[in-house]
Amino acid sequence: MDIRKEYLEFFRSKGHEVISSMPLVPDDPTLMFTNAGMVQFKDIFTGAVPTPKNKRATSCQLCVRAGGKHNDLENVGYTARHHTLFEMLGNFSFGDYFKEDAIAYAWEFVTVNLALPIDKLWVTVHNNDDEAFDIWSKYINPSRIMRFGDKDNFWSMGDTGACGPCSEIFYDQGEENFNGEEDYMGGDGDRFLEIWNLVFMQYERTADGKLNPLPKPSIDTGMGLERVIAIKEGVFNNFDSSNFKPIIKKIEEISSKNATSENIGSYRVIADHLRACSFMLSQGILFGNEGRPYVLRRILRRAVRHGYLIGFRKPFMAKLLDTLIEIMGGHYTELVENKNFIEEQLTLEEDRFFKTIDLGMSLFNEELEKTKDIFSGVTAFKLYDTYGFPLDLTEDMLRDRGLKVDLAKFDELMNNQKAMAKAAWKGSGDTSNEGDFKQLLEKFGSNEFVGYNNTTYKSKIIALLDEHFKEVKILEKDSTGWVMLDKTPFYATSGGQNGDIGALEDNKHIAIVEETTKFHGLNLSKVKVVNSSLKQGESVDAIVVNRNEVAKHHSATHLLQSALKIVLGDTVSQAGSLNDASRLRFDFTYPKAMTKEQIDEVEDLVNSMIARGISGNVEELPIEQAKKKGAIAMFGEKYGDVVRVVSFEDVSVEFCGGTHVRNTADIGSFYIVKESGVSAGVRRIEAVCGTAAIKYTKDIISKMNEIQAEVKNSDVILGIKKLKEQIKDLKKEIETSQSKTSSPIEETIINDTKVIVSVVENGDLKKIVDDTKNANEKVAIFLLQAKDDKVLIVAGSKNTNIKAGDWIKNIAPIVGGGGGGRPDFAQAGGKDTSKIQEAKTKALDYAKENL
């Protein structure tokens, strides 16, 4: 049985509209990831957006709980049902049906469609929810209905807002299978497994804690697909179901090791984390050092560490992707469409971690031998900072041994170094003004953007806000604040395009528009009042400046993406962008630096597209029709049922809400200024076009003229080559001079080994040591030099019993220093030049004792 399909079709038959899973990156600044089915309907439940015509919806939502408030990462592999990524089935009513129908639908699906035995089912309701109790009593013996308090059976979005009692359906997995102390209804054991939660949103909680009945109660339900599949297949652990078992078998195959009771946890971790990493990558989340990218990195590295435990020493995750696609690719086509990209990114990140994991594990095991109760916070930090071990990975390794990290010391080091993981999520968002924006939205509604065809517009000021987003009636001269126009020509920052700037004018006053941003559906422009004042209710001329230049760069970005796909291949995808009047920046997925030839080819391709004078076309299409047309969507972006599509004939077709030129010829010319790396697997191109390109070429010509004058040669390249030759010759002279020391290097023979211990006044110590080792088959050399009130020490050893690193460690403290290195080469520094001769003597004594 395809339970996912069965569920969606069941609720479709009950008048529900089937809604696709929303992106894992939610359009909600308070959430790290989409973590429940109701997230995409939150604005409907709160009244922030109008209720749709069809007040019934159903979905199968991909969810991630591995960061922020909801984090199951540390439990994965140790329990039967925790996952970093899971699917949540849900049905929703927006002021339509309520408890009677919600319970009836749930009971029908569970007992008829799933055919679960009634004598295995239990139900919970809130202590005070007699209505739900009475309804359930029609379907199940009241002795199987349990009442619980707020902790278990009351749900709310937050301290205020929509909330209500909930009712949960449990499945009894059998006393014969689970008979521990916690295996009772309401206990923490695994015998009674919650499979479905029905939330009855019937109240609004106010700031004083009062519960006011909602005029139109709603329904929000959630059922974990993985749990239901396990129940239907008669297994007691989600990882033993058909959702995971094929992946675990594939791990056994490629590792040539069968899972055992001792190591099965590692196989389960890898299977789970493969799913999370693959879906996150497919939706444009890339590996990085902060925010969501860092969570992705933590998940992947945890999987690699468990792979290491079962014998993997090189990248292996990509080899599992085909198996995952066989299981989930039929419903989630993004896995198939982005298969090559996912494999590429997994392999790159795994390879990076495998290069340091041996060293990190050695350090970990070394510290572990010294640990009794608390693992060193200093070592945990070094594992993180030097070897790329996330803290929770170290904690995970200690968990099996019953040990903990000295978190106080770890945090102290992190704070001192301002480590990037200290505040892992930059996008946490400031929600302190959310109530103010909601009030504005309720008061005025969303204001209309009219700027696609207008750069000037007669608008009315419907709201003014001060710098802290508090509503005011007037903004005085020289003050800064925010303006909400009834109809605005100013484009708000989104989709990689910077918000418009410009001015608000009339006969009396002028305000400079410094930026335009969207807050909770409101287009607001930040203004600086430079003359007179701005008052609510007044009409002004809204004037956009530099729009044409911004449009040129945005359209050029679309052409650039097409050119990159032609030159580098279709696996290239957008990872971010920025467009303003002076430049464009385009981030894209590619595993290595572009060659000069590739950069030139891309630049030439874009300029040829510009020269063709291709007409632009903008249309709004149903999303499925747009996809069939080949429109490229930005990974991670949230789209509605109808999307805006910008196309330049067959050259470029993209989902886009930004502003563009009418014809590619309007762009003028295009120059790539820089190609660089952003992170592993992500490259960045910076480019200019239009007026900015003219300025760029003028600057280049000006600099060339300056260089020409400096090198005193009409052929600049030839002049630079001559200068480089002169510099090379001068460097040789300096090196020769430095290698000639003012004091002779002292040599001696100890047990057939040449030993050099000397104080050198001038010269490059490292070069002298290297040259000496190259010139001798068997030699030990120890050089000291006083320079700028400091002591430099360099030691080398070739085919002798002396280890240079140990030699340095023993002598450097004499001059107040420290250092170390390899057995064949080491160096150190010291502060006390007065002890240099003593150090020399001790160094020679050390050689005599060890040879």
Curated annotation (Swiss-Prot):
Reaction catalysis annotation: tRNA(Ala) + L-alanine + ATP = L-alanyl-tRNA(Ala) + AMP + diphosphate
One BP annotation, GO: negative regulation of DNA-templated transcription
Pfam families, A to Z: DHHA1 (PF02272), tRNA-synt_2c (PF01411), tRNA_SAD (PF07973)
Domain comment in the entry: Consists of three domains; the N-terminal catalytic domain, the editing domain and the C-terminal C-Ala domain. The editing domain removes incorrectly charged amino acids, while the C-Ala domain, along with tRNA(Ala), serves as a bridge to cooperatively bring together the editing and aminoacylation centers thus stimulating deacylation of misacylated tRNAs.
PANTHER family the record matches: ALANINE--TRNA LIGASE, CYTOPLASMIC, ALANYL-TRNA SYNTHETASE
GN (gene name): alaS
Originating organism: Aliarcobacter butzleri (strain RM4018) (Arcobacter butzleri)
EC identifiers of the protein: 6.1.1.7
Binding site for Zn(2+): H554, H558, C656, H660
Gene3D superfamilies: 2.40.30.130, 3.10.310.40, 3.30.54.20, Bira Bifunctional Protein, Domain 2, Threonyl-trna Synthetase, Chain A, domain 2
UniProt-recorded name of the protein: Alanine--tRNA ligase
First-level EC class: ligase
Function of the protein: Catalyzes the attachment of alanine to tRNA(Ala) in a two-step reaction: alanine is first activated by ATP to form Ala-AMP and then transferred to the acceptor end of tRNA(Ala). Also edits incorrectly charged Ser-tRNA(Ala) and Gly-tRNA(Ala) via its editing domain.
Cofactor annotation comment: Binds 1 zinc ion per subunit.
PROSITE patterns: AA_TRNA_LIGASE_II_ALA
SMART domains, A to Z: tRNA_SAD (SM00863)
Location, primary (coarse class): cytoplasm
Location of this chain's protein in the cell: Cytoplasm
Family to which the UniProt record says this protein belongs: Belongs to the class-II aminoacyl-tRNA synthetase family.
Cofactor(s) essential for the protein: Zn(2+)
GO molecular function, one term: aminoacyl-tRNA deacylase activity
GO cellular component terms, A-Z: cytosol
Keywords tagged on the record: Aminoacyl-tRNA synthetase, ATP-binding, Cytoplasm, Ligase, Metal-binding, Nucleotide-binding, Protein biosynthesis, RNA-binding, tRNA-binding, Zinc
CDD domains reported in the protein's UniProt record: AlaRS_core (cd00673)
